[in-house]
């Protein structure tokens, strides 16, 4: 058994380095394990004796006695003792290295348990003066909230022995990437108390998201093969027989046996252990009292959940998951750690053979074991999870929704920024400007920087100016003042003589030109020489970072800055030039994205300047620019801050005075020397004073965090420039502390002293290093900004300046008051206090005020937080090239508000503001206030401020709280980004953290739920999104910090790739519109109506709709007619039997080719003439009669692929008088889902016989088919190619009112229905279509659609025979094989009319988008096409048709010819664009009015506008009205309601097997309750509206002449709202009814100015009712599709009032979690709905029917039955 303490020193150092590499992410977990095992190999062979047993637990565990109970201690295998609450208290990273933590099980359990039985914990500071132990003693002793401040008495006597070990062990502490982030211990305690307080409340468990196994394997360190979505309440218990033993990977046992506070229940099995095992480690589960966390209704004696990864079982996994081998990781002990009796995982979900992603048929394959998944409660796994989510949401919220329902944005805005009447108000007097001391320039200080360099370079040329350390910590090169001077002169001379070619012209650099300085962070010496070279030449340097690696931020923002500054030359070093990205072809330096073309100039190896070259004779103006420094704003745009020469030298003088710099001092600099504090001190002020700077590159700091302290000790440095993270890192490097002496240090400048976490790092650093000579007055926090430079600085030594010597201060402030912008002192022990330290006083010669951060710059009150503004001779001058922003930032005149008394004494008191003086102040971007004695307190920055529901929160404060949520072992300390995003008019807080690689799924969720609670209770603000990303995934700044803007940008564009996401919109979003409530009168009407309507309730039959002639209160009633069929020739007027027509055609034109079938190559596969069709039909009739014994009126099922056999079989049945039912054949690749549907239709239609072709008959009887349908149970099956013995006698005579065929189809809601079509309907439908589309024998019509139901069937089989035109048939599956097939056919056969489906349009648009040039080469010309009708039963898909038209316009397609038809179950063709009708009209309606069942017309491009296009033109003989689906009242024009249709070709009722036609009876004979109450209509089941429209022949968009209605009109107004439109349309006033104006159709052009357009909005059954409003899924889906380019398809449905969004991810599985926040944001923003569940699935999972419509109900069933195999399921809280 090894303790690292017993290892030799060199091994310990190597181990520490390894740990550091792992924590930095420089080495993989696997490589780490390997190297570590190798290192420890020689020391592992020592025998383990009794001494092991007596090893005390390491002193960094806060061992607590669990309520003095006599249980055997709740001990994790890590030795982490657990209190009865189920917390584990571990300091953030114990000094044991992480892997040791994970692998070593050193302490015998009984031994440790015995220790934990010691008496109640008492106070005592354990161990070395570690920085974790800083909490002041005292306070609530029994509180479980402290980390490591108290140890049980059992440890007191061991302390002395442990101290040395403790110190040694700290050497292995992980040093994490803690870029300037550091947490306050006070906060830590507050967080723990807050969490403890919350713990008392019974908490419903939040469901944990489900991840697919492969995603789990990808996410850091998770080998748990967790079931895709399981939940412990709904899983049958199973046990493994005790003889099976499994070896667990060690980290699983250690990390997951303890469920720390199961707020979120992980998806795990219930354990089923016998009590006999309590002596084993399993004891710990039973100790954790489970009562507190189970949902309130569960009995306390439930077994606690067993938090272990499921074990591998012998069941085979499906083909896509390789069997998992659980291998043990390197083990230090030889004993195998065996565990018995855990449950086998449920792998049933993957047992089905791998499903092909076939959309059309996806989810009926529930294998047997899945059916048994439901337990006694009968709940599905998913449903249990959603139940949990619902219970969570039922919890009363702290902030109720404001009570209002409003459509418009102003109200949403007001709701987002509520004013709290109880908010504290500032009470102090108005502040006065604070003056810094007078600037006294020491005698002999050089006049300018150039003079300084010349003086020191000649007089003391050997004294060192700068030294840089190499990555090993050795001093490599020192730059003396002499060398600096000569090199800078060389550069200045070279730059003045070098000629750069800028395109054709030659240019030299003139004084005042701007150049870029591009140097790596480890080469300050070249940077300084180049900087002073530019100074000597009068050039303006702009130092920039060079992103060398792809993980850095995109450099294009910097490129914009370079372009705007007009920079063409970049100075760089040779080494840096070599590292620049080169172009592969030319080998030259590649042009970076967004960058201008640069000339690179290397500043080394330059010739000596000639004797006469004198740098001193350049006299630059003081107001000229000296340099430009880049800075970024909140949104991430990069700006250049221009600094004048006067400001630069003044600032150096002020720093010299404030810091008491003298010549020859040594400074150590850890900061970035290219900008801000690092640049001002180490490059500029140091040269002015002739000081020596030692630079420590960031790479060395990562490797040896204490190197800066060692340098101070070695060089006796007097000043040091650091950030608080360097103090923190230095504290952790305890092994180096013994040799350090900081007594020479007079100033330790903390550059980010303004951050809330800097206070505790300063305090702890001082407490540890005071013993090493550090003086308390040496620590100098300062505040700075690029605009103001140094805002304030605590003076070193304190005594010499004019302020009181003891001028340091700290304030304990109330965070709640700060969020309202007010300073209030809080008590020390308050949970919600923030402790701030001062940032010193105002700089010499500067004047400071604090002004309001919003609105005009009015002076703040003394107790008010505002933005700090400074005026002095040493601030920046402007943002380069941005005049507007410059004026608002650099030219601020603070205003003083005064009350003006009215003259006559009785008027109102006015507030007037006047400037306090002439001076212009500069905004610093820092928020704060001035304390007593002129001390400056900074409590945030303008960029880090988040205003959530009217209260201000500082990102840094939230980071501090997040960091204090222990245990920190789940995430990396400093790698946290907090920012806000604007969603639904308010800012929402997002927290992104980097997760450690060894953190399991449950642990990270445990941690996330604690963070939510901590932030909520301390800041009273909800976190909207909390995400964990894999290690090193947050974008970095060049010095290793987090690049916040870039992280935010990636988050918003969906390229951050988080490993875990928790969204909490339900608790954060409090400004949703109030749900609508029904009016009283309407509710009763709604109750009376029996229909399953969609909840349209606001047009009840009431006084508003009193009938006035044919108008409702001046508004037309919604009614429209197609033209009269009577205008056609006489033969069309009387109905004809289709069989008679066919026989007539066979006699009169026997050789006329009537059908042509094409194959996938576009070649003619088969043709049929009229006589061939007639003969084959006769033959099939004979076959049916002879072999099938079919009588007239019998039902025959036709199962054929799209083709000519289907036609012949159909007419064969009609000849016989039998009733055919066409059925789509089953899909050979997907039999087990498609075959049951086929069988169902055969059964439901009562077909006595099946007619088909040989391949399909074989398929029906195959072995594969037998698994789902027994082949013996089919009715008799006939082969169409069999020959009958006799000829068929004669065509049966049937009546017009007998059934011709049954039309079966499955609706999008999954309802299978068959409608009965009589011969009369069939004949009138054909007549109507023939008339509208002008079809006659010489026409060619191309059809590319499915011939099984609706209009597709009519076009394919009936209309060609009726009108005799030539039909060119293309089966849609052929187009999948050859996407250009349909278009090339149109071109080749010069087709004028074509009918297709949306599936075909989509396929062409997607597959051919890049092939237009090649199609042109093949001479494909679409100018011949006159009408292209998309056959659909839904709202026309405007976007898709527009894309299609735009794409193929290039091939001559006239965009006006594409239109959509509308048909439905009750009538297959209501609207079809005719041959001579005008193009479809578009209108824009307000989406928010639509969801309240109103139609409000708006202009194109208006917010919330939705483009709706009319569905073709009404067919001749069709009459359509709009009725309220609930009340059956007649609606007015432009009102939303159900479309009712009256036509001779309506279907004649449903044919259903169950005979329950009661419910659907009124679908075919509905009557209005107002108006013409005697007429019968068929109800289409679709919502829509009618609108009188001008037939514009030109512009398809809303014409300027159409007045738009105000986008909102209330329920009562909407009746009148459209009436003003009528004034424009003279026809309306002439003849109120549209019949007169439309009679004559095309014949009379004057009459065709107006027509009634039918606009379909969506199916009644599909409407989603949420929060009292009605949404159409397509609208939500369109929003979701737009939110990320990787979303291939999307479908939404509701389940128990939760909105579920399913998105198909067309990309890498690692991108799945990017979609969750984006989907949630988009739906909130566009529809004001909160998404409850986001399911990310593979492409092809959303099922789609043959018409290209989504089967949302199938999808829902598949989701609830857990058959989707999702990549990720996120449950939004």
Curated annotation (Swiss-Prot):
Location of Phosphotyrosine modifications: 60-61
Signal sequence, start to end: none
Record's compositionally biased regions (Polar residues): 113-125, 146-165, 272-297
GO biological process per UniProt: acetyl-CoA biosynthetic process; axon guidance
Knocked-out gene: effects: Mushroom body lobe defects including ectopic axon bifurcations and/or axon guidance defects. RNAi-mediated knockdown results in an increase in the number of mushroom body lobes as well as ectopic lobes and guidance defects.
Gene Ontology molecular function, alphabetical: acetate-CoA ligase activity
Domain of life of the source: Eukaryota
Residues annotated as domain DMAP1-binding: 3-110
Presence of keyword Electron transport: no
Pfam families: AMP-binding, AMP-dom_DIP2-like, DMAP_binding
Tissue spec. comment: Expressed in the developing nervous system. Ubiquitously expressed in the developing brain. Within the mushroom body, a higher level is detected in the core of lobes and peduncle in the late third instar larva. Detected in whole mushroom body neuron structures at 48 hours after puparium formation and during later stages.
Gene Ontology, cellular component aspect: plasma membrane
Compartments where found: Cell membrane
Biased composition (Basic and acidic residues): 176-185, 241-253
Biased composition (Acidic residues): 224-236
Coiled coil: none
Keywords: Cell membrane, Developmental protein, Membrane, Neurogenesis, Phosphoprotein
Family that this chain belongs to: Belongs to the DIP2 family.
PANTHER family: DISCO-INTERACTING PROTEIN 2 (PTHR22754:SF32), DISCO-INTERACTING PROTEIN 2 DIP2 -RELATED (PTHR22754)
Task of the protein: Required for precise axonal bifurcation in mushroom body neurons by suppressing ectopic bifurcation and regulating the guidance of sister axons. May function by regulating expression of tdp1. Acts downstream of the serine/threonine-protein kinase Bsk to modulate the direction of axon projection. May play a role in fatty acid metabolism.
Protein name: Disco-interacting protein 2
The encoding gene: DIP2
């Amino acid at each position: 058994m090894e303790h690292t303490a017993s290892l030799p020193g060199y091994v310990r150092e190597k181990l520490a380095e390894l740990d550091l590499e792992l924590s930095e992410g420089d080495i993989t977990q696997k490589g780490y394990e390997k190297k570590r095992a190798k290192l420890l190999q020689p020391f592992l062979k020592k025998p383990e004796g009794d001494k092991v047993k007596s090893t005390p637990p390491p002193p960094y565990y806060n061992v607590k006695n669990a309520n003095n109970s006599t249980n055997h201690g709740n001990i994790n295998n890590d030795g982490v003792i657990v209190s009865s609450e189920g917390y584990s208290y571990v300091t953030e990273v114990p000094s044991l290295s992480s892997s040791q933590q994970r692998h070593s099980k050193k302490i015998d359990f009984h031994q440790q348990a015995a220790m934990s039985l010691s008496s109640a914990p008492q106070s005592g500071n354990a161990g070395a003066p570690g920085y974790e132990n800083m909490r002041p003693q005292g306070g609530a002793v029994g509180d479980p909230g402290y980390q490591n401040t108290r140890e049980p008495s059992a440890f007191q006597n061991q302390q002395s022995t442990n101290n040395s070990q403790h110190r040694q062990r700290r050497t292995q502490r992980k040093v994490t990437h803690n870029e300037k982030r550091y947490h306050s211990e006070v906060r830590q305690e507050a967080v723990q108390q807050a969490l403890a307080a919350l713990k008392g409340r019974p908490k419903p468990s939040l469901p944990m998201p489900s991840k697919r196994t492969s995603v789990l394997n990808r996410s850091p360190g998770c080998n748990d093969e967790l079931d895709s979505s399981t939940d412990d309440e709904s899983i049958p218990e199973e046990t493994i027989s005790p003889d099976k033993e499994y070896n667990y990977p060690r980290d699983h046992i250690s990390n997951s046996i303890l469920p720390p506070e199961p707020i979120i229940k992980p998806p795990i099995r219930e354990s089923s252990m016998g009590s006999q095992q309590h002596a084993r480690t399993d004891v710990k589960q039973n100790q954790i009292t489970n009562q507190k966390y189970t949902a309130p209704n569960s009995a306390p004696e439930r077994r606690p959940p067993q938090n272990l990864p499921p074990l591998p079982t012998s069941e085979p996994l499906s083909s896509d998951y390789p069997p998992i081998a659980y291998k043990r990781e390197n083990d230090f002990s030889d004993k195998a750690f065996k565990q018995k009796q855990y449950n086998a995982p449920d792998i049933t979900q993957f047992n089905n053979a791998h499903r092909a992603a076939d959309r059309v048929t996806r989810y009926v394959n529930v294998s047997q074991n899945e059916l048994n998944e439901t337990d006694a409660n009968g709940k599905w796994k998913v449903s249990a999870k959603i139940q949990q989510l619902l219970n969570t949401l039922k919890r009363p919220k702290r902030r109720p929704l404001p009570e209002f329902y409003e459509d418009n944005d102003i109200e949403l805005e007001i709701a987002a920024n509520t004013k709290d009447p109880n908010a504290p108000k500032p009470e102090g007097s108005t502040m006065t400007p604070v003056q810094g001391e007078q600037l006294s320039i020491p005698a002999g200080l050089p006049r300018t920087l150039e003079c300084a360099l010349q003086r020191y370079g000649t007089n003391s040329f050997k004294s060192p100016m700068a030294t840089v350390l190499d990555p090993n910590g050795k001093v490599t090169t020192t730059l003396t003042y002499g060398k600096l001077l000569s090199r800078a002169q060389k550069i200045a001379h070279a730059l003045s003589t070098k000629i750069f070619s800028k395109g054709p012209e030659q240019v030299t650099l003139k004084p005042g030109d701007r150049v870029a300085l591009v140097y790596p962070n480890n080469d300050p010496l070249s940077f300084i020489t180049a900087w002073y070279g530019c100074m000597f030449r009068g050039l303006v340097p702009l130092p920039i970072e060079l992103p060398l690696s792809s993980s850095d931020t995109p450099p294009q923002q910097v490129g914009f800055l370079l372009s705007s500054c007009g920079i063409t030359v970049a100075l760089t070093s040779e080494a840096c030039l070599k590292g620049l990205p080169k172009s592969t072809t030319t080998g030259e330096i590649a042009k970076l994205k967004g960058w201008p073309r640069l000339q690179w100039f290397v500043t080394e190896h330059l010739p000596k300047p000639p004797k006469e070259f004198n740098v001193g004779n350049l006299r630059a103006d003081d107001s000229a620019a000296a340099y430009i420094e880049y800075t970024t704003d909140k949104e991430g745009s990069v700006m250049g801050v221009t600094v004048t020469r006067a400001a630069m030298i003044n600032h150096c003088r002020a720093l010299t005075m404030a810091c008491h710099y003298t010549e020859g001092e040594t400074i150590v600099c850890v900061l970035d020397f290219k900008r801000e504090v690092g640049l001002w001190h180490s490059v500029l002020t140091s040269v002015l004073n002739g000081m020596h700077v030692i630079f420590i590159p960031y790479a060395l700091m990562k490797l040896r965090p204490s190197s800066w302290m060692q340098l101070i000790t070695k060089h006796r440095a007097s000043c040091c420039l650091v950030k608080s993270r360097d103090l923190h890192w230095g504290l952790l490097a305890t092994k180096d502390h013994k040799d350090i002496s900081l007594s020479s240090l007079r100033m330790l400048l903390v550059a980010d002293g303004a951050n809330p976490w800097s206070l505790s790092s300063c305090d702890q650093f001082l407490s540890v290093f005071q013993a090493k000579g550090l003086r308390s007055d040496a620590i100098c926090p300062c505040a700075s900004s690029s605009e103001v430079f140094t805002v304030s600085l605590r003076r070193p030594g304190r005594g010499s300046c004019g302020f009181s010597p003891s001028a340091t201060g700290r304030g304990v402030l109330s965070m709640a008051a700060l969020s309202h912008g007010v300073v209030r002192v809080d008590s020390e022990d308050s949970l919600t206090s923030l402790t701030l330290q001062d940032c010193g006083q105002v700089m010499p010669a500067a004047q400071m005020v604090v002004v309001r951060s919003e609105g005009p710059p009015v002076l703040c009150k003394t107790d008010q937080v505002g933005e700090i503004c400074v005026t002095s001779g040493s601030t920046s001058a402007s943002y380069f090239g941005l005049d507007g922003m410059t004026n608002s930032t650099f030219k601020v005149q603070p205003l003083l508000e005064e009350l003006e008394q009215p003259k006559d004494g009785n008027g109102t008191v006015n507030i007037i503001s006047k400037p306090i003086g002439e001076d212009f102040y500069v905004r610093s971007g820092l928020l704060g206030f001035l304390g007593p004695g002129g001390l400056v307190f900074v409590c945030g920055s303008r960029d880090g401020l988040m205003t959530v529901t009217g209260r201000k929160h500082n990102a840094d404060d939230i980071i501090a709280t997040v960091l204090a949520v222990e245990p920190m072992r789940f995430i990396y300390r400093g790698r946290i980004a907090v920012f806000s995003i604007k969603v639904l008019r308010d800012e929402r807080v997002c927290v992104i953290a980097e997760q450690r690689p060894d953190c399991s799924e449950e642990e990270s969720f445990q941690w996330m739920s604690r963070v939510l609670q901590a932030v909520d209770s301390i800041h009273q603000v909800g976190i909207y999104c909390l995400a964990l990303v894999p290690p090193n995934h947050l974008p970095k700044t060049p010095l290793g910090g987090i690049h916040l803007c870039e992280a935010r940008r990636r988050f918003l564009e969906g390229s951050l790739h988080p490993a875990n996401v928790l969204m909490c919109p339900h608790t954060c979003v409090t400004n949703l519109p109030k749900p609508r409530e029904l009016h009283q009168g309407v509710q009763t009407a709604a109750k009376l109506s029996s229909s399953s309507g969609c909840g349209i309730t606001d047009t009840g039959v009431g006084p508003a709709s009193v009938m006035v002639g044919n108008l409702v209160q001046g508004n037309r009633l919604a009614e429209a007619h197609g033209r009269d069929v009577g205008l056609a020739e006489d033969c069309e007027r009387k109905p004809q039997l289709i069989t008679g027509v066919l026989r007539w055609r066979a006699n009169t034109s026997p050789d006329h080719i009537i059908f042509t079938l094409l194959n996938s190559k576009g070649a003619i596969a088969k043709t049929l003439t009229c006589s061939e069709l007639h003969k084959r039909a006769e033959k099939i009739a004979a076959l049916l009669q002879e072999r099938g014994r079919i009588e007239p009126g019998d039902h025959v099922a036709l199962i054929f692929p799209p083709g000519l056999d289907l036609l012949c079989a159909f007419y064969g049945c009609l000849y016989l008088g039998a009733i055919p039912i066409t059925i789509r054949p089953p899909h050979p690749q997907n039999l087990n889902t498609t075959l049951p549907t086929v069988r169902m239709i055969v059964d439901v239609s009562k077909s006595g016989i099946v007619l088909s072709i040989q391949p399909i008959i074989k398929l029906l009887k195959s072995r594969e088919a037998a698994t789902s349908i027994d082949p013996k149970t089919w009715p008799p099956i006939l082969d169409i190619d069999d020959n009958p013995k006799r000829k068929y006698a004669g065509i049966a005579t049937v009546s017009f009112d007998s059934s011709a065929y049954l039309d079966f189809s499955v609706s999008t809601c999954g309802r299978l229905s068959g409608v009965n079509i009589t011969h009369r309907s069939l004949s009138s439908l054909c007549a109507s279509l023939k008339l509208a589309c002008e079809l006659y024998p010489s026409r060619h019509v191309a059809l590319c659609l499915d011939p099984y139901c609706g209009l597709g069937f009519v076009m394919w089989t009936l209309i060609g025979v009726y009108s005799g035109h030539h039909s060119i048939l293309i089966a849609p599956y052929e187009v999948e094989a050859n996407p250009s097939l349909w278009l090339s056919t149109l071109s080749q056969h010069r087709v004028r009319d074509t009918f297709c489906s949306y599936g075909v349009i989509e396929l062409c648009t997607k597959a051919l988008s890049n092939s237009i040039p090649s199609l042109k080469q093949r001479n494909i010309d679409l100018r011949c096409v006159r009408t292209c009708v998309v056959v659909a039963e839904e709202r026309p898909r405007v976007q898709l048709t527009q894309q299609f038209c735009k794409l193929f316009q290039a091939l001559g397609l006239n965009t006006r010819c594409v239109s959509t038809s509308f048909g439905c179950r009750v009538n297959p063709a209501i609207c079809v664009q005719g041959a001579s009708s005008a193009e479809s009209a578009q209108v824009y309606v307000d989406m928010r009015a639509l969801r309240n069942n109103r139609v409000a017309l708006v202009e194109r491009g208006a917010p919330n506008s939705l483009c709706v296009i009319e569905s073709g033109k009404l067919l001749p003989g069709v009459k359509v009205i709009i009725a309220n689906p609930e009340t059956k009242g007649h609606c007015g024009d432009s009102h939303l309601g159900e479309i009712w249709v009256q036509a001779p070709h309506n279907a004649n009722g449903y044919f259903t097997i169950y005979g329950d036609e009661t419910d659907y009876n009124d679908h075919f004979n509905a009557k209005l309750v107002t108006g013409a109450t005697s007429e019968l209509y068929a109800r289409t089941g679709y919502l829509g509206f009618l609108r009188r429209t001008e037939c514009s022949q030109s512009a398809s968009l809303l014409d300027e002449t159409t007045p738009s209605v105000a986008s909102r009109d209330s329920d009562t107004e909407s009746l009148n709202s459209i009436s003003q439109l009528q004034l424009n349309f003279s026809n309306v006033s002439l003849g109120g009814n549209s019949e007169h104006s439309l009679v004559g159709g095309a014949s009379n052009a004057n009459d065709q100015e107006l027509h009634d357009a039918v606009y379909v909005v969506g199916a009644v059954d599909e409407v989603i009712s949420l929060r009292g409003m009605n949404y159409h899924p397509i609208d939500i889906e369109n929003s979701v599709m737009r939110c990320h380019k990787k979303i291939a398809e999307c479908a939404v449905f509701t389940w128990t009032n939760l909105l579920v969004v399913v998105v198909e991810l067309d990309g890498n599985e690692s991108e799945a979690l990017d979609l969750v926040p984006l989907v949630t944001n988009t739906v909130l923003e566009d529809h004001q709905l909160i998404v409850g569940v986001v399911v990310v699935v593979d492409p092809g999972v959303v099922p789609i029917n043959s018409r290209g419509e989504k089967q949302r109900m199938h999808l829902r069933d598949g989701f609830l039955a857990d058959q989707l195999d999702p990549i990720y399921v996120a449950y939004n809280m």
